[in-house]
Regions:
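C-terminal accessory helical subdomains adjacent to catalytic cores in phosphodiester-
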Residues: 7-15, 31-201
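N-terminal beta-loop-helix "entrance" segment that forms/cooperates
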Residues: 10-26
Length: 201
């Protein structure tokens, strides 16, 4: 039988940082090292994937300029992921970009966000309105002032009197864990496709 385990590699290796990508060059170097140092055998079979935000993605990623010209968000991401896969050239590699950033997943369970910040229940109603407008969390746009994380921060910290200081990494982890992967998959088509690819491997 093959052994199952997983390793998570951060895009930012400095202590007390929230991640973020600086350059495709660094990403490719890290992936290339992992591919070379993890060979498949009869005991271990490896799958490599990414979870990068499309929002604020470095422009030197393969296919980036062409993808930006594609109006349909899903077709745009498909082009970007295909270009990334071609550049890496390894059948074990499954690229994934989050539309439009990780915080979009929190829109799958706004009630869970309210549980963490109960005094902002009224403010969080605007998040429900945003979700209804766009149809699903993955379509909430990536404008610097209206990206999912910016909308959430505004709901939690906005108002005449700031009641909370929004903790972005801790909240994202806690809320998505509370929502559960089944709900995330049911409400986010591209996220679900990624999970299905990983399961199929």
């Amino acid at each position: 039988p093959t052994r199952r385990s997983s390793d998570l590699v951060s895009t930012n290796k400095k202590e007390n940082t929230q991640g973020g990508l600086s350059s495709y060059t660094h990403v490719k170097e890290d992936i290339s090292i992992m591919l070379r140092t993890n060979a498949d055998n009869t005991i271990e079979q490896h799958v490599f994937t990414t979870m990068f935000d499309f929002y604020a993605l470095p422009s030197n990623f393969p296919g980036y300029n062409e993808a930006k010209e594609i109006e349909n968000p899903y077709e745009c991401i498909q082009h970007l992921e295909h270009s990334f896969s071609v550049a890496i050239e390894d059948k074990r590699f499954i690229p994934y970009f989050q539309l439009h950033e990780f915080e979009a997943l929190l829109f799958c369970g706004i009630d869970s966000l309210v549980e963490k910040y109960p005094k902002c229940k009224k403010n969080c109603e605007q998040l429900t309105n945003v979700l209804q407008k766009f149809g699903n969390p993955e379509l909430i746009n990536s404008n610097p002032s209206t990206a999912p994380s910016k909308r959430i921060i505004n709901a939690i910290e906005g108002g005449k009197k700031q009641l909370y200081k929004y903790n972005k990494p801790a909240t994202a982890k806690a809320v998505t864990a509370n929502i559960g992967i089944d709900v995330l998959r049911s409400k986010c088509p591209h996220f679900n496709e990624w999970i299905e690819k990983l399961i199929a491997k």
